[in-house]
Amino acid sequence: MATSSQPVAQPATKSIVGQLSLLDRFLPLWIFLAMAIGVGLGAIAPGIKGVFNTLSIGTVSLPIAIGLLWMMYPVLAKVRYEELGKIGDAKRQFSVSLFLNWLIGPAVMFALAWIFLANEPGFRTGLIITGLARCIAMVLIWNMLAGGDSEYCAVLVALNSVFQIILYSPLAYFYLMVVPSWLGLEGTTVDITMWDIAKSVLIFLGIPLAAGIITRFYFLRRKGREWYETELMPRLGPTAMIGLLFTIVVMFSMQGDRILAQPLDVLKVAVPLLFYFVLMFFLSFGLAFVSKFGYKMSATQSFTAASNNFELAIAVAVATFGIVSDEAFATVIGPLIEVPVLIGLVYVSLWLSRVAFGRREAMPEVA
């Protein structure tokens, strides 16, 4: 595993945006298009809600369940679970990361949700469950663009995947029901139990996690790492976008009237998310810097803590609160804001590498 004593990777000479794949580069655009298609579909065919609800798994229609499961599966098949054995190589760094991801991150999102959305319980809850979903996908891209520690990031992603199964449900119940009661705040207006959340996590994270692990270890053994990384994942990985966009189309087709009547709802959710990404990035970078982790490790710590697993947040919100809920709506705004903000923070990270760590290489072009 790379450590802080190793040389910092040379920054890319190609523009940061140019290094992203077409799908990742225009993710906000694809999401906006999916929203628009969904709203249009709902207006043209108002009976579509009944079609989607004809078959269901619990409270989730079968088509939506398939979309939710599929958008998680390729992401989890990409995680390097075999790297978990390297945790002992950087115990201090992993301890700091777990502290940032599972204690500070959820608490910061909880605070921002209540500050900005005190009178919007649905949106507030959606933000809180988004803050609990630690990033396991896009962080690999941000880390690579910023010249972070790729090995450490891979292990951390695998660790967060496992921790989400264990910690997501109790932490969600804690921040939605217990903490508001302690602080004398109004609790969520939806009557939920820890089992309601756990059931959603077990289905929509547990199933694709198991499938991803089986897929990875089976094909690594049968075909080898090179085939898996260069042949299978380039084909399988992008299909996660199909599941995500399909889910968004259906969500917005079922609440198009509400969206047209209240277009500023997107802005209500976007503002605290923007604060969250920026706060977590600088807080994490500052902590890593004073801990003398070096640039590569500091960048990885920062992007891991500042990013979120919006696929899991969407799945939990839809399964627990319903596809037309404010909670589900709020989780969809996450990737809209995260992608452009994190691209900007990559530039900030590279600038900090020069200012705080003495890098003299030229910055990448902006476009």
Describe the residue ranges of each PLM region.
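Alpha-helical transmembrane segments of multi-pass small-molecule/ion transporters
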Residues: 1-78, 82-306, 310-367
